[in-house]
Amino acid sequence: MNILIIGLGVIGSTYGFLFKQAGHHVEHYLRNESHKKGIKQLSVSLLDGRKSAEGIQTEGQYDITLCSKKRYDLIFVSVAQGKISLVMQEIREEQFDGTLLICCNLWLDRATLDRMMQGYHYILGFPVAGGRLEYGGDSIPSQAKLDACVFDHFMLENVSSVGITNGTDVCQLFASCNIQLEQPHDMIEWIALHMAINAAVITVAGAATGINDSAQAAHRLMNSTTLLAEVIKIVRETLKIVASRGINLKLLRDKLWLFYLPARLSAYFMKRMFARNNLTRRIMELHGNIEDLLYICECVYNEGKSNHISAPIFYRKVALLKAKL
């Protein structure tokens, strides 16, 4: 496939690297004023979970090719802080054409998203990967390092339920990279649920340690049953906020059972999972985009307040988190 990655962020670069390794043609679109536009190559350190549950540490180089045309088979969009409307404005201004794969945190309903995407065929996904980019000390770097991890699956809407013509090709793209597809009942609901759970994790870690050093905050959280028990209690509150959007949580009980056990018992299971699962632990350590972490918390917080949902522990932790910024 001919693939355009919007930007040069962690998620786009990670999957772009994998797509290129699998033989696809991958280009990146960067604004003229972007400080990343001079980057010609990424040094990649990847904890690869596609063939091993523990992950295999690999090293590689990713040569960056900038966009050279307007028509692509797939346009891969992963943007932080929910700035999808700004990205769509740029896509329209550049007159890019192709199926859009939108894979980022979004706190929107389907009607709003459809209006935003008007004129384009799109499909929603969500990456199961994470990492960080390091540019060194240059103001206009020519090289950078990508430190990332990737799991063996990717969340994707059922291609038969969306109006794209090349759904089979999109599925085959991931298959060519040895990545399995998981297809939730409703991708919008799945993303909202994912953000609600993450908001609980972020606020507990941030209130305890601050998130300016997100790796330290993650370490402390993963090693503490006390903090993990707080996460469980707050997830119960943020799930009520998700339900206030009209999402039927009863349909998701099989995925949420852990949060309905006694909090200390759930915390024990979570701590054991972090201790045993190298990939999960690593993705927690690497997620350091503070603005995006705050965006997740604020989306859930604002929805709860607007809908008058009682979530006292969550609201208090958000205030403590902001006080430590």
Roles of regions detected by a PLM:
Residues 1-53:
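NAD(P)+-binding Rossmann beta1-loop-alpha1 motif at the extreme N-terminus of oxidoreductases
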Residues 20, 116, 175, 243, ...:
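Anion (oxyanion) recognition and catalysis
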Residues 55-142:
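Rossmann-like NAD(P)(H) cofactor-binding subdomain of soluble oxidoreductases
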Residues 107, 113-196:
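Rossmann-fold dinucleotide-binding core
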Residues 142-157, 208-221, 276-287:
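Helix-loop-beta segment of a Rossmann-like dinucleotide-binding subdomain
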Residues 178, 182-183, 217-221, 303-311:
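Inter-helical turn/loop segments and adjacent helix faces that build the functional surface
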Residues 188-219, 225-239:
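Active-site-proximal catalytic alpha-helix in oxidoreductases
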Residues 232, 236-325:
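NAD(P)-dependent Rossmann-like dehydrogenase/reductase catalytic/cofactor-binding core
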